[in-house]
Structures are given as C-alpha cells and as structure tokens.
Amino acid sequence: MAIHADTHDDLRLFQTGEHACGYWSGRQARDLVLDPHDPRLGAIYPQALAWGFRRSGDLVYRPHCERCRACVPVRIAVDAFHPDRSQRRCLARNRDLVVRVVAAERTDEQLALYRQYLKHRHPGGGMDQHGATEFDQFLIGGWSHGRFLEIREPAIAHLPGRLLAVAVTDVTEHALSAVYTFYAPEAAARSLGTFAILQQIQWAQRERRAHLYLGYWIDGHAKMNYKRRFSALEAYDGRHWRGLPAHASVD
C-alpha cells in the first residue's frame, strides 16, 4: 500500500497482522505502519501526526482494525485552551514543583522511575521487565526530535529535588506530541498525568506551536476519559480535524 505525500513521492505503508488489543480485553487489533526503513521518516513525521499517526519507538503507526474504529486521534489547539476548575486546582496543588525540559537522553534516575512505574502499572505483563535497552527503543528511538519534560520536587541545599515524573514529548515545527508519561506511583494524589499535559500545553504556547497531540481517545473507555476534559480538543475523522466539546472534570 502507498499514500501520496506532499513531496510527490510514494510512502509505503504496511498492515500488521492481528494482535491483542491494548485497550479492550478479548479483542483483536491491527495497525497501519509507515515504512520503518524510509530514510525520510523523521521529515514525514509532522505530516503523519496530522494524518492521525503516532510514534512508538521508531515505528509510526495508526490503528486500522477490521471491525472497529474506536481509536480517535485527538489534539489540543493550545491557543484556544482554557483550564477548567479542576485543572486550575491541579496547577495550584503542584505549584511547588520544578518543571524543566531536558534532552531526550536516558539517565539512571529516569530509568529507575520508569521501571517503578511499569511494575506498578503493568505487573506481570512483560513491560515491567523493561530495562535500559527497552527504554531507549520505546521512548527515544533513532530519529525522533524529542525532549523530556521533567517534574521534580523542590531543590534541597542546591541539589535537584526528587524526580516525580517524566513526560516524553516529540517536538515538530508546529506542534508537540505527548508520547508517554511515567511518574512516581506514590505521588498519584498530585494528578501528575494531568499536570504534565498542562505543562506541555504551556510549553507549546510559549514556543508558538499550534497543537499538542494526545494520541488516541476511545469513547467509553475509563482510562481515556481524562482527554475529553481538556478544552479546545480536536478529533480526526480520517479526513478533517473537528472540534470536540470538553467533558466536565470530576473533582
């Protein structure tokens, strides 16, 4: 299969075989994947985001299930975003934290937090065995232009505070893409996942980037509901991006 790109060159796509769905137990899924050996992949990636694709490691994929279209690509138009009451409370609750953007280069501290998060979130599923190699392959890859947004406790005696969360973020000319966020399980009361997205929105606003891509939203899936709580959310229907009304947050 091929698609016609703005460069007037053909891009090859591959369809995967069926595999277990990562969102619904008992269902099968399959994906469309841009040719991982295409040397233009890094240059194509910004347009691929606009086509509803997403990055995992060096793979750029989009769900393409035979009988299901539940996965909807979503993004935030950051200039039109306004936090709701719950999100303002999240910002206030975490105003003591230190946020900085660093190079996408693994550190021992980040790896330890990543492994702690996976053991808490995905026990016994294989991901909890990830080490340095899997960290680099899954989060960094070989061609992406990524950054890590680090969230830390306040510094003590001029030493960096404890690392609480890392939001892996791809950077393109006109957008940011939230690739993966991991955080200290014991700090769950801080709503660090939401806080990370709010920080990514502010980052995009500072750098005058139009959108923050959030991956896929699934209507009725409990783990996806948080994405609908952000205002200025847009969904891709396969041809166009259209606005979605925000759902009210539950404090």
Swiss-Prot record:
Q: The organism sits in which domain of life?
A: Bacteria
Say yes or no: keyword Cytoplasm present.
yes
Q: What Pfam families does the record point to?
A: ATE_C, ATE_N
Tell me where in or outside the cell this protein is found.
Cytoplasm
Q: Which reaction does it catalyse?
A: N-terminal L-glutamyl-[protein] + L-leucyl-tRNA(Leu) = N-terminal L-leucyl-L-glutamyl-[protein] + tRNA(Leu) + H(+); N-terminal L-aspartyl-[protein] + L-leucyl-tRNA(Leu) = N-terminal L-leucyl-L-aspartyl-[protein] + tRNA(Leu) + H(+)
For this UniProt record, give its keywords in alphabetical order, as a comma-separated list.
Acyltransferase, Cytoplasm, Transferase
Q: Name one GO molecular function term.
A: leucyl-tRNA--protein transferase activity
The broad enzyme category this protein falls into is transferase
Q: Name one GO cellular component term.
A: cytoplasm
Q: What is its EC number?
A: 2.3.2.29
Q: Name one GO biological process term.
A: ubiquitin-dependent protein catabolic process via the N-end rule pathway
The record's family statement is: Belongs to the R-transferase family. Bpt subfamily.
Q: Which NCBIfam families match?
A: PRK01305.1-1, PRK01305.1-3, PRK01305.2-3
Note the PANTHER family from the entry.
ARGININE-TRNA-PROTEIN TRANSFERASE 1, ARGINYL-TRNA--PROTEIN TRANSFERASE 1
Q: Which HAMAP family match?
A: Bpt (MF_00689)
**Protein name in UniProt:** Aspartate/glutamate leucyltransferase
Q: By which gene is this protein encoded?
A: bpt
